[in-house]
Amino acid sequence: MSSLPRLYYVTTGLDEATAFATWSAVLAPLFEPRGAGPGKKTPTGSASGVIIGDIIIAKVTFAAQDFVRDAGRIAVTPDHLLLHLYMTGGFNGEITRQQTTIGPGKVAMIDLAYPVNTRAFASSTISLIVPRMLLDGVPLDRMKPRLDPFRNDLLAAHI
């Protein structure tokens, strides 16, 4: 039995330019990271995970930053569904066509077919990235960016 492919990207300890370049490259299929707040500190983060077929599961930690997904990025990258469980931290902003606030213990349902514009706090998350083709028949157009408390707790426990 062969082992599953793994992802491991750490920016801790790298010089600022290399850390930003690495973090930007890791996020490129999903978002553009931008400095947030008055100081606009260079955005950095780390991700480690596993690829299971077409699905990616990863633990992701990052400093406070803005995440942007615009029409240009949408046109040239996959429009997967990103389920993002925030263990710590959270964000405010627009995902899945709605203004949303997500905090610790909550799952963000991010439809990458639409623009994203969020301001994130320093966070630790578990991410599940599912290709749209695996969700055939699921009415994603009715999906909300937040789950009701029961479904959120059930999905968070499962993740």
Question: Which positions does each model-derived feature cover?
Answer:
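Alpha-helical bundle regulatory/interaction domains
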Residues: 1-46, 55, 92-159
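Short secondary-structure capping/turn segments at boundaries of alpha-helices and beta-strands
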Residues: 44-48, 69-71
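His/acidic/aromatic-lined binding-pocket segments of jelly-roll/cupin-type domains
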Residues: 49, 73-75, 80-85, 100, ...
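Glycine- and acidic-residue-biased ligand/ion/polar-headgroup-sensing regions
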Residues: 53-55, 62-66, 73-93, 132
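Short linear motifs in exposed loops
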Residues: 60-61, 111
